[in-house]
Structures are given as C-alpha cells and as structure tokens.
Curated annotation (Swiss-Prot):
This is Guanine nucleotide-binding protein G(s) subunit alpha. Belongs to the G-alpha family. G(s) subfamily. InterPro entries: Gprotein_alpha_S, Gprotein_alpha_su, GproteinA_insert, P-loop_NTPase. The lineage of its organism: Eukaryota, Metazoa, Spiralia, Lophotrochozoa, Platyhelminthes. G proteins are composed of 3 units; alpha, beta and gamma. The alpha chain contains the guanine nucleotide binding site. Residues 180-188 are annotated as: G2 motif. Gene3D superfamilies: GI Alpha 1, domain 2-like, P-loop containing nucleotide triphosphate hydrolases. GO terms for cellular component: cytoplasm; heterotrimeric G-protein complex. GTP binds at residues 46-53, 182-188, 207-211, 276-279, 351. Residues 349-354 are annotated as: G5 motif.
Length: 379
C-alpha cells in the first residue's frame, strides 16, 4: 500500500509539472502573439539602386544607435571600392562614348592607364598613390566631361561624392562619417531585417534586393505585412538598367509598382511611395542637359497643379513641375483599386538627408498605425 501511494503521488506530481510547463508555454505563445500583433512590418520594395538600403541605414541612425566605431571602420573597404568603381567607370567610358572624350591634359594619360590597367584588377590593394591619382584625374576636364555624360553608361550615384574626397578616403586614419556610410553603395542580395522602436511602437523593416534576379524572393515577405514602402529614384529618368540597357529606370519602376499594386496577394496592403533622390533630380533639371520630355514626351504638355505651384512658389518652378510630374505618373498606376482596400501615399524624399527622412517617417507613422489597426480589424 505504501508503494502504491508513493506511485500515485509521483504521478500526481508529474502531471502537475506537465500542467505548469504547458501553462508557461501557453503564456509564452500568448505573449508572442501579442508582440506579433503589436509589431508593424514594413516591406521595402523598389528597383535596384533606388535607395532602399539607405532608408534602412537612416532608421539605424534615427531610431537605433547609429554605427559604432568598429562598424564605421568595417565600411572603409566598401567605400574605397565605390571610389575605385567610380574612377574606373569614368575612365573606361571615355573612349566608348559617341563622340568619344579625350583627356584635357596629356600628362594625365599615365594616371588613366594606371586606373584602367592596375586599379581594375580584382586583387588591387589600394596603395597611397591610387588616391593621389584619383584626385588629380578627377580634376581633368575630360574626366569631368565624361562624368557629365554619365547617363550614357553605368555609374554609381555616389561617384562625385567620393571622388571629391578621394584624398580623405585614402588617409591612413580615415574613419567614415555617417554621411559617408549613407552614400556608400553595396549591392543588396537576399532579405535583411532591421528591428527598431519609436515611442514604444515596434517596427520590423525588411530590405529586399531590387535587381530583377532578386525579385523572386519578394513573395517570401508578403505574409502579415503592415505596409509596403515602395522606393523610386526619380532622378534616373535619363538612365537605363544595369541588367537591361534597353529599359529606362523610371519606366521599370512604374511597371514594378503596377505589378505590386495589381498582385492578388497584396490587394489589401497599402503603399507608402517614396519618390526618392529629389536632390539629384533637382540638379539635373537645373543643369538643363537631359530634358525630361526626351524620355517622357508627354512632359512637354504637363502642367503642375496650381495649388502645388502656389505652395512651392519660393522654389524653381521647373523643378517643382518635374517633381510633381513624376508623382502623378506613379499615382496613375495606383488610380485603380481593382477591388482591393489599399491606398497609395506619396512622399518626396532624399534618402541621404537624415532630417528629410526623419520628417517623412514621422508623417508616415500615423498612416502605418491606421493600416495596422485595419489589418487586425480594429478600425
């Protein structure tokens, strides 16, 4: 009898232990559900080189702890590679342009030869003279002329920024600034998640590669998305894709937005539209060398809304007209809801300008909160 009693007690204790464990698991599951429901998941989409990864970097600067000294040092190689890619692209394009461009100073020929023959090698190790040669060559009139024609070949947006500071980038004690890190271009391949909180609200931002071969991965991120942030580089109206020289970059972005907007899995997911690289668009419009109507003929007859011109009356009217032309082009794509419950919210952005992104993201937070409440049928 004693043995039987002990056995019953042991069974009872085991059952209680299992019950307690189950309760703990249920509590954890409930907590995870609450955390999941209280988290705003933002999916960053857009064509390659539109500025998506720069937006993520801004979130780190604004809402996390920015970049540590170690992380800044880790970016040095990527920044120097940007510098090398820039000078190699410009020097290499001189002879292939129609008409071709010659160096202004014949003594710079040996510098260009060094760039094309030595600096372009895969195992190049960035000796001190490379940065000196970059700085000298960058001042050559022929190199500058080739740079001005960069829409005729492929050149990273940060080329001028890093070539202007070639000697600084090459200094032994160089530590990148936040602006250097924002400008640095690194190809995004795969899916990267960034978590941050703003006023006790949790955000998960997913950055997905924008090149065509990367887009098949996008569907992996569609589940439980609060909102899509679609990033389009308006300044690329006179440029073609790296992966398809027959396709205009802005037209690719328009087609890409249309495919997202009309996707049957996303008919209830609203889009926050970042019309990005407004700084570069302004520069191109003011320079007057690449006319928008050459690439978008209907721009010739486009008139910006009167209230828009009045609101921006202190700015150059042609720049304002260009901005809102591209805004309206993208809004045309989203004018038909196709039976869905989604909306498009456009914003003019400059991803390398921290204050601009702070302002825009603050404006978006209320929109994102409403989308989140609607998603869980609380609104």
């Amino acid at each position: 009898m004693v043995i039987g009693c002990c056995t019953l007690n042991n069974i009872s204790e085991d059952a209680k232990t299992r019950s307690d464990a189950n309760k703990q698991i249920e509590k954890l599951i409930e907590k995870e559900k609450k955390n999941f429901k209280s988290t705003h998941r933002l999916l960053l989409l857009g064509a390659g080189e539109s500025g998506k990864s720069t937006i993520v970097k801004q979130m780190r600067i604004l809402h996390i702890d920015g970049f540590s000294e170690r992380e800044k040092k880790e970016k040095i190689d990527a920044i120097r590679k940007n510098l090398r890619d820039a000078i190699c692209s410009i020097a290499g394009a001189m002879g292939s342009l129609k008409p071709p461009v010659k160096l202004e100073l014949s003594e710079n020929r040996k510098l260009r030869d060094y760039i094309l023959e030595t600096a372009s090698k895969p195992d190049f190790d960035y000796p001190p003279e490379f940065f000196t040669y970059c700085a000298k060559l960058w001042k050559d009139g022929g190199i500058q002329e080739t740079f001005e024609r960069s829409n005729e070949y492929q050149l990273i947006d940060c080329a001028k920024y890093f070539l202007d500071k070639a000697l600084e980038v090459g200094a032994p004690n160089y530590i990148p600034s936040e602006q250097d890190i924002l400008r640095c271009r690194v190809l995004t391949s795969g899916i990267f998640e960034t978590k941050f909180s703003v006023d006790k609200v949790n955000f998960h931002m997913f950055d997905v590669g924008g090149q065509r071969e990367e887009r098949r991965k996008w569907i992996q991120c569609f589940n439980d998305v609060t909102a899509i942030i679609f990033v389009a580089a308006c300044s690329s109206y006179n440029m073609v894709l790296r992966e398809d020289p027959s396709q205009n970059r802005v037209k690719e972005s328009l087609e890409l937005l249309a495919s997202i907007w009309n996707n049957r899995w996303l008919r209830n997911i609203s889009v926050i539209l970042f019309l990005n690289k407004q700084d570069l668009l302004t520069e191109k419009v003011l320079a007057g060398k690449s006319k928008i109507e050459v690439y978008f003929p209907h721009y010739a007859t486009y008139q910006a809304p009167a209230d828009t011109l009045a609101e921006y009356r202190h700015e150059n009217s042609e720049v304002v007209r260009a901005r809102f032309f591209f805004r309206d082009e993208f809004l045309k794509v989203t004018s038909n809801n196709n039976g869905g419950r989604h909306y498009c919210y456009p914003h003019l952005t400059c991803a390398v300008d921290t204050e601009n992104i702070r302002r825009v993201f603050n404006d978006c937070r209320d929109i994102i909160q409403r989308m989140h409440l609607r998603q869980y049928e609380l609104l």
